[in-house]
Structures are given as structure tokens and as C-alpha cells.
Amino acid sequence: MTKQDQEMPTKYHPQDIESKWYEYWIEGKFFEATSDETKKPYTIVIPPPNVTGKLHLGHAWDTALQDILSRLKRMQGYDTLWLPGMDHAGIATQAKVEAKLREEGKSRYDLGREAFVEKTWEWKEEYADFIRQQWAKLGLSLDYSRERFTLDEGLSKAVREVFVKLYEKGLIYRGEYIINWDPVTKTALSDIEVIYKDVQGYFYHMKYPLADGDGAIEVATTRPETMLGDTAVAVHPEDERYQHLIGKMVKLPITGREIPIVADDYVDMEFGSGAVKITPAHDPNDFEIGNRHNLPRILVMNEDGTMNEKAGQYEGMDRFECRKQIVKDLQEQGVLFKIEEHVHSVGHSERSGAVVEPYLSTQWFVKMKPLAEQAIELQTTENKVNFVPDRFEKTYLRWMENIRDWCISRQLWWGHRIPAWYHKETGEVYVGHEAPQDIDNWKQDEDVLDTWFSSALWPFSTMGWPDEEAPDYKRYYSTDALVTGYDIIFFWVSRMIFQGLEFTGQPPFKDVLIHGLVRDAEGQKMSKSLGNGVDPMEVIDKYGADALRFFLATGSSPGNDLRFYWEKVESTWNFGNKIWNASRFALMNMDGMSYDEIDLTGEKSIADQWILTRLQETIETVTRLIDAYEFGEVGRHLYNFIWDDLCDWYIEMAKLPLYGEDEVAKKTTRSVLAYVLDQTMRLLHPLMPFITEEIWQHLPHEGESITVASWPVKSEEFTFEQAMGDMELLKDIIRSVRNTRAELNVPMSKEIELHIQAKNEDVLTQLERGKHYIEKFCNPSTLVMGTAIEKPEKSMSNVLSGVELYLPLAGLLDLEEEIARLEKEENKLEKEVERVQKKLSNQGFLAKAPEKVIEEERKKEADYLEKRAAVRARIKELKG
């Protein structure tokens, strides 16, 4: 699809080029891993997005970084696999489908399990297509021939294998335990699916009367509705206040049920009254105390958060309505004697927002300690997972060291059905890859597995495991890098590591690059409730994918959050526009040059040598920084090289030979320009793939696509140290003269007299080599250069490294008029200095004004003083 013979469009319109190139790349199969044994493999698996809707800016950021790595490695000659896929997202997807059914006046129970799951598969297909369209608009170089879904048969086989193996090792068990229960979605939640928020609540202080009528014992709770399930009161065995009561019974208010006073070391004697009500079915700590003392477990709530038959007169009431009523009843009985305001941390469901209920339930669990221990041990070996930035390794280890057993069963229909069956008569439990042969005598467990159970197997289940001879598993596992946000280190990263170690004997990835969250311009997290979210597709429609990608890749340092600014995306579009215009100019002056005509052997100008050297430095720096995941620095170096060195300096200097009469110099400059643009497009390609492909196809080139063009390698042949020194001196001189012209309002078209005093003969030789550039870009009527030049009268001077510049002012401006103008400016600044200093010496102002306001005044003072000094120096210079 070469476009070398076609002229580039005048204007840069990303929308005109982006979709066509993605189609071209897909049709050309440039992104497909080749399994070429002569190449070293490089593998990344995409963190699979949920099939619940649109991708957000966080997805765009995450995938942009992965695409940079994938495109780089592909160009470096690796057999690169970037494996795409999606997550079934059990609870999230089921909630979406149920909401859609409610709009039709139906529930999942109206459909039945099989029909509901079928309906959810239809949802998945619709949204999977939508996600692929978004991936395409982002320009992601994914190998779609290997796309996976967490409910694919291959992945389901891996899930069953892992469940069965862990069960056989005693690492998966079924037990009654206090779990986090979401009464809205009616399912268990793992600890990390619970969001804790500080809530204004109350401590309710009650007195439980002793059964023998001899006094009462004081307890307190934030959840008085749970008292209906109390089965004991606990005190510390060494608490002298209560030692005589241990073993006695108290009468539970309202119910009249008698419960014992037990002694347990868990109780904090210093907190409250030192006596604690024990509700084993509704609190994890009480559950443990109950186990130690063989206490009964009385569950007083239904799964939907209403009170059950064990709650007696409160049966059927919502838990919070019950709380209000029970408080009222306890007050009437004289049992509740104090209500104290209390801010405490309350768990909420990440998915529904409901207050989570600690709830006694029979669930499936993974015994975590043995699995966590080997993951912790890994980090002491050479084979450790490298966290970038490394501070996140401590976060990861701290969580692993304090890990609790993982509740993996979910009361849902969408997901991996737990491969366990119960015998209808004997109750025997059977766990296996397939159902028992006499299936009529068995009933399968109704629950599905936590979504993160299958996600934890993603790096190897997608490669064909448990078939360890599967070609992709043998070649591409383990993977090289994982890119993900710090918010799912616990949910996902840690679980992939311990499952990878347990089932493959090696970590699932070498490096983990951690990025932060995308926030709005004020630093707030983007959310639906705040209405501050930004759709990446909207950004692409306005500015193009390249602008968004460059902004996302370069807008933050590793591990930190990224603030989204529309203005910054616009500035990256401007960067693309600058590249477009520079490339268009270059192509217009290449006179139809072919790739074979590029000849870099001829004599090169200072500018040619300098840009070639700067290119080599940029190649070395950019390659090193990408390998170190320093994408922000990559962007900064590329931006500076392209905008400043290539566009603002070299292309301007290249116009001298291009518009000149020397055909040999013209041909060399064309060759240098073609070569530098080609190499620059390759360097920029991983960050801005569309514009670089478009420009590269117009340039003299060989090969089908820049996506598979070789990555630039630093060449000592094109490193010219002398030209670097010459060019820096020339740039300093040209900049200085331009700045002075601007200060004096002398246009570039007006000739000036320029005297340059060189520090020594070496510097003078440099000046002689670059004289034609000084003449072109400073526009002097007279240029005097030497090592013993006297400063002309009434001249401006500027001291630079190695030289001093003198600009005689006679004829350039009316000296008397300019001095008068500057003296007027000096008087104005003097008044501002007096005003601000008077304010800063006012003790009343300093005592009352906010620190920020005082700091602003101090900055003003420094600014005015600096400007006044500059004006005074200029007046002195003009007066001679």
C-alpha cells in the first residue's frame, strides 16, 4: 500500500488515516505471532476487560502502554505475541443482564437458569464486538487469531483442572464461615470486593440482666438487630470485675433466652465496659470465639437482608427498620441506657453499594497460606517478579503475609459452575472434571466461581494449559510483562502469581508495570456519580488516537495517577500537526527520491552532521527508556528531538542547500532528511502508530509496513562530535540575536551590524565553519568576527559560552526615545516594588492573610525586582 508517488494531503486529519491503516494491518496479519523459531519470543497478555460495556480511559492508558512494548519488540525482531481477550465478569455482567430483564418486567427466575445463561451469552457477543471496535480505534496491535474469553471451553477446562487439583491437595474446602454478604446481589464477596467507608453511626449501650436476678452486665454494639442472635457474653479471664460472673447466665432482653458468660483472651479489658456480646452467626471474631466455646450459631437474617423466623416478632422486617424498632423496644424495657454518636468504618459492596452483612454461610474456600508462602519465597530468588516501581513489591508482600482464606463461591448463574456434586441420598460430595456417571443420583452445586478464580489462570490458560505440550504454552509462557493498575494488585496480580507457581512451577510474568488511576483535571477519581468521566472514543473522534495515546503514555511517571486535560490532548494533536507539516515540506523537496537513491556517503554540512548525531543520541536514549518503562521520558525526548531539533532547527537550516544551486549538497541534504525522517517515524511509531505509518508510506522506504520495519540502532558512523559543539555555539548565537531583536522590536527583515568576540582561535575556527548560518539566520549587514574585537559604542552586548556578541544600536532605534521608554517602565516597576514591600512589612497582613496569599505576594516582589534590575541594566547599556 505504498503511497510514495502520492502527495501528502495539505491538512492533518487523523480521522482520514486511522481507520484505513488498522484495516491494512489486520488484513496483512502484521500483528500475528509467527512461532518463528529463529526469533526470540516476547509475550504480553492483555488484562481482559469485562464484557459489560464501554472501555474507559483507564483501559485506554493500560493498553497504550502494552502496545508501545509490543510494537517495539516486533520492530526489534522478536516473535511478539500480544494476546487479547475478555472476562465474563460474573457479578457485573449478571447485574447488567438482570437490569435489562427488569425493564421488560421479568426476572432471571422467570427465564430459568439455562435460558438466562443463553441470554447472557447474547449480551457477551454484542459487547465483545463493541470492545473490539474500541481496540481498533485505539490502534492496538493485538493478535486476534489467539483471542480468548474466560468462559471459552479451553479456559473452562483449565478452571476445572485447577479446582480439582487444589481440592485433592486439601487446598480447596467447603465450610461454614462468616463471609461478606451482599443482600442486594445476594452473593458472597471476597474481602477485596468490599469498600470501607467512614459512616456516622451509634454505639448502643445495653444492660443484660443476670438470670439469677443479681444485677446486670453492660455491653455495647453498633448493630443492635444482631442481639437476637447472641449466644454468649464474653469477658477477659483476667478481668477482676467479672471473674465472679464467669459461667453464670444472663437473660437476653426481648427474647428472654438465657446465654452464658464466657472467658476469652480476645476481649479487650480497656475497651468500653470490658464485656462483649457474642453473635457467632453475624461477626467473624464472634464466630471464632463461638468455635472455641462450642456456642450455637443463630442466624437471624435472610439472604435479602430481612429478618428471618429466628428474629421472632421482627420477622420480615428490613435489617435497618428492625434496628430502629429494636432500639425503641429496648428503651421501653429500660435495657438501653445510652446512645453514643460513633464514626466507624462500614463495608460496602463494590458492585451494588449495599452495606455488607457479615453472614454465616456454607461456601467454598481456597486455603491461602501454603500458596502465599511459595509466592513470598519467590521474591527472595533470582526468578522473582520485578515490580515497576519497586515500592509496589512491599505492598504486594504485605498483603500476602496477612492473607486470609479466599471465599471463591458466588451465588450467581453466570460463570464457571463449581465442579462439585452432592449425592441426593447420602449427601456425599464428588468433585471432578466431569459429572458422575449415575448423574440422576447427584445434584450439582448451584454456585459459580468468583470471577477472579478464572482470571488468576489467564497467563497460562490462554496458552493451552493444562496441555503442557500445547505449542503456544511451550513457546510463549511465561510472559514477559504485565501492565496493570495498582488497584488490582490484590484482586489479580497476586492471584496470578500464586496460581502460576502452583500449576506451572514458574511465575506467570517477569515484570509487572504498575500505573495509577486516571483522574480529572482537579485530581478527582473519574466516576459516574461525579459525572466527570471522559469517553476515550470521544477524545479519538475529536483529536485522533495518536494524540490520546501520546498524552496517556507520557502524562505520568510509573505508579502514579494521571490527570486528564483536554488542553494537553490538544497540544499532542498540535505535535502531530507539526510532524505532518514538516514531513510534507520534506517530501515536497525530495524530488521523487527513491529508497535506493538515499546516499549518506557524501560530504555533510554542520547541520547534517548535527541532526544525524542527535538522532543517534535519541535512538539510544529512547530504546533505553522504553526498556525501563519510562514512557513519560520517552515522550519528552522524542518531542524535544522532533519539535526543536528536527523541525525548528534542522529543517530551517536544510533550506539553504535545498533552495541553493549546489546539486551535490542538495542531494546529500535530501538523503539526510529522508533517512532522519524514516528513523524518527520508526522511533515514534510505538506511541503514535497511525501518523507514522502514513508518513512512512509516503517516504522513500522498503517493506510493507512500518509495524514490521526494523527498530533503529545507534550507529557510530553517524556520530560527529565536532558538529555537536559547532551547532550548540551557532544555536546560542542565533537565539541571542533573535531575542535581542524581539526586545528592541527590530524585525528579522531589517539588517543589523553584528560583532562576535571569540574567546580563542578554536572558537573563531568554529565561527568560520558556521559563518553562512549566522549570515542567514541573523541577517547582518556587517558581520565582524575575531579574538580581539573592541565593543562598539552604544551597543547591546550578550555574553555566551565562548563568545561575546555586540549589536551596535545606531540606526536600529531612536536611543533617546528608547531610554525614555525604559525609564518610564523603571518608574512603574519601582512603584510596584514599593507597594508589595509595604504590604509584606505590614504585621497585620502577615498575621491574618493565608500562607498562599503571602507566598503569592513574595513571588510578585521577586518578579518585580528581577524586571527592574533588567530594565536598569538595559538603560545603563544604552547610555554607554
Curated annotation (Swiss-Prot):
<feature type="coiled-coil region">
    <location>
        <begin position="809"/>
        <end position="879"/>
    </location>
</feature>
<dbReference type="InterPro" id="IPR033705">
    <property type="entry name" value="Anticodon_Ia_Val"/>
</dbReference>
<keyword id="KW-0175">Coiled coil</keyword>
<dbReference type="InterPro" id="IPR010978">
    <property type="entry name" value="tRNA-bd_arm"/>
</dbReference>
<dbReference type="GO" id="GO:0006438">
    <property type="term" value="P:valyl-tRNA aminoacylation"/>
</dbReference>
<dbReference type="InterPro" id="IPR014729">
    <property type="entry name" value="Rossmann-like_a/b/a_fold"/>
</dbReference>
<keyword id="KW-0030">Aminoacyl-tRNA synthetase</keyword>
<dbReference type="InterPro" id="IPR009080">
    <property type="entry name" value="tRNAsynth_Ia_anticodon-bd"/>
</dbReference>
<dbReference type="InterPro" id="IPR002300">
    <property type="entry name" value="aa-tRNA-synth_Ia"/>
</dbReference>
<comment type="function">
    <text>Catalyzes the attachment of valine to tRNA(Val). As ValRS can inadvertently accommodate and process structurally similar amino acids such as threonine, to avoid such errors, it has a 'posttransfer' editing activity that hydrolyzes mischarged Thr-tRNA(Val) in a tRNA-dependent manner.</text>
</comment>
<dbReference type="GO" id="GO:0004832">
    <property type="term" value="F:valine-tRNA ligase activity"/>
</dbReference>
<keyword id="KW-0067">ATP-binding</keyword>
<keyword id="KW-0436">Ligase</keyword>
<dbReference type="InterPro" id="IPR037118">
    <property type="entry name" value="Val-tRNA_synth_C_sf"/>
</dbReference>
<keyword id="KW-0547">Nucleotide-binding</keyword>
<feature type="short sequence motif" description="'KMSKS' region">
    <location>
        <begin position="525"/>
        <end position="529"/>
    </location>
</feature>
<comment type="subunit">
    <text>Monomer.</text>
</comment>
<comment type="similarity">
    <text>Belongs to the class-I aminoacyl-tRNA synthetase family. ValS type 1 subfamily.</text>
</comment>
<dbReference type="Pfam" id="PF08264">
    <property type="entry name" value="Anticodon_1"/>
</dbReference>
<dbReference type="Pfam" id="PF00133">
    <property type="entry name" value="tRNA-synt_1"/>
</dbReference>
<dbReference type="GO" id="GO:0005829">
    <property type="term" value="C:cytosol"/>
</dbReference>
<dbReference type="InterPro" id="IPR013155">
    <property type="entry name" value="M/V/L/I-tRNA-synth_anticd-bd"/>
</dbReference>
<dbReference type="GO" id="GO:0002161">
    <property type="term" value="F:aminoacyl-tRNA deacylase activity"/>
</dbReference>
<dbReference type="Pfam" id="PF10458">
    <property type="entry name" value="Val_tRNA-synt_C"/>
</dbReference>
<feature type="binding site">
    <location>
        <position position="528"/>
    </location>
    <ligand>
        <name>ATP</name>
    </ligand>
</feature>
<dbReference type="InterPro" id="IPR019499">
    <property type="entry name" value="Val-tRNA_synth_tRNA-bd"/>
</dbReference>
<keyword id="KW-0648">Protein biosynthesis</keyword>
<dbReference type="GO" id="GO:0005524">
    <property type="term" value="F:ATP binding"/>
</dbReference>
<feature type="short sequence motif" description="'HIGH' region">
    <location>
        <begin position="49"/>
        <end position="59"/>
    </location>
</feature>
<protein>
    <recommendedName>
        <fullName>Valine--tRNA ligase</fullName>
        <ecNumber>6.1.1.9</ecNumber>
    </recommendedName>
</protein>
<dbReference type="InterPro" id="IPR002303">
    <property type="entry name" value="Valyl-tRNA_ligase"/>
</dbReference>
<dbReference type="InterPro" id="IPR009008">
    <property type="entry name" value="Val/Leu/Ile-tRNA-synth_edit"/>
</dbReference>
<dbReference type="InterPro" id="IPR001412">
    <property type="entry name" value="aa-tRNA-synth_I_CS"/>
</dbReference>
<keyword id="KW-0963">Cytoplasm</keyword>
